[in-house]
Design a protein with these regions (language model features):
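C-terminal/domain-terminus segments
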Residues: 100-128
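Glycine/small-residue-rich pyrophosphate-binding loop that anchors the diphosphate of NDP-sugar donors
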Residues: 90
Length: 128
């Protein structure tokens, strides 16, 4: 009842930096981390369409068309990672007081959650 017709800031509440997550994500995916430098994901993935088709065939993945799999996410990631910006943006911080007062208090570890969902995507053959 406290949540009816309300708008809430929804976040796990944990402040994190992507560069701190890369080693754990790489471990789940059985790959090495790359250099810590900016990367234009839209250009990167656009240049690897044939590579994805080959990976998808080799690993029996569900989606062989990389652009269908990604949708617009690689463009959104460029925005979130501030690709091309002169300086890194500050972490996005929002107040979660209102949502907690309405009774939504559950939280999840960010690294563990990302690792879990990458494992699910792998198990369901969306990624190799």
């Amino acid at each position: 009842p406290n949540a009816a017709n309300q708008t809430f800031n929804l976040t796990n509440g944990e402040v994190f930096l992507w560069r701190d997550l890369w080693p754990a994500l790489a471990d789940v995916l059985d790959v090495d981390t790359g250099p810590d430098e900016p990367l234009d994901l839209a250009a990167y993935f656009s240049e690897r369409i044939d590579t994805w088709q080959s990976l998808a065939a080799t690993h029996g993945l569900i989606e062989t068309n990389l652009m269908r799999l990604l949708g617009e996410s690689h463009h959104y990631a460029n925005l979130c990672f501030a690709h091309g910006a002169v300086a890194s943006p500050p972490p996005a911080l929002v107040s979660t007081i209102k949502i907690k007062q309405a009774g939504f208090t559950d939280t999840h570890n960010t690294e563990a959650s990302f690792c879990h969902w990458l494992s699910v995507l792998r198990d369901q053959r969306f990624i190799p």
